[in-house]
Amino acid sequence: MKAVIQRVKRASVKVNGELISQISKGLLILLGIGKNDEEEDIKILADKIVDLRIFSDENGKMNLNINDINGSALVVSQFTLFADCRRGKRPDFTNAADKEKALDYYKKFVEYLKSKIGDVKEGVFQAYMEVELINDGPVTIILDTEELKKPRRRKE
C-alpha cells in the first residue's frame, strides 16, 4: 500500500460538481492499493499515519499527531500511485490491485482508520473526483508499506 499524506487546512471532494466530503484541519490521504499488498498492510499504514507527529505544537515544532489536534482525515483512493513509468510514455498500472481487492482493502482501511481517528471522510471509489485542498506548510509525506516493513537501518 502506498499513501501520499498532505497536512491540510481544509480539503474536499466533488463528483460531477456535487460536494461529497469535506474536512477542516487534518490530513488528506491519497491511498493506493497494490496487487501484492496483504491485509496486514492496512493496519501498518493506518497506524503509522495516526502516529505521525506532523502537526505543530505551541512552539512551532512538529510534535503533535492528528488526534492531538482533534484533526480530521479525508481518504481518497488513487490507483495511479502504482504507476510504472520506466518505459514508454504512458504509465503502466499493472502493479495496482484489481478493483475487487482494491475496494475491499480500501473499505477495511477506512474502517480501521475510523477506529483510530474521530472524524474520517471518504471520496468515492473508482469515481472521477475533483479534490481541492489548502496545504498547510506544505507538509507532504509519502508512505509505502513495502518500506515500512523493512528493518530500520542502523546508525553507524
Swiss-Prot record:
Gene Ontology cellular-component annotations: cytoplasm
Enzyme class: hydrolase
BP-aspect Gene Ontology terms: D-amino acid catabolic process
Catalytic activity: glycyl-tRNA(Ala) + H2O = tRNA(Ala) + glycine + H(+); a D-aminoacyl-tRNA + H2O = a tRNA + a D-alpha-amino acid + H(+)
Pfam families on file: Tyr_Deacylase (PF02580)
Gene Ontology molecular function, alphabetical: D-tyrosyl-tRNA(Tyr) deacylase activity; Gly-tRNA(Ala) deacylase activity; Ser(Gly)-tRNA(Ala) hydrolase activity; tRNA binding
Compartment list: Cytoplasm
SS bond partners: none
Enzyme Commission code(s) on record: 3.1.1.96
Domain free text: A Gly-cisPro motif from one monomer fits into the active site of the other monomer to allow specific chiral rejection of L-amino acids.
Family: Belongs to the DTD family.
Protein name: D-aminoacyl-tRNA deacylase
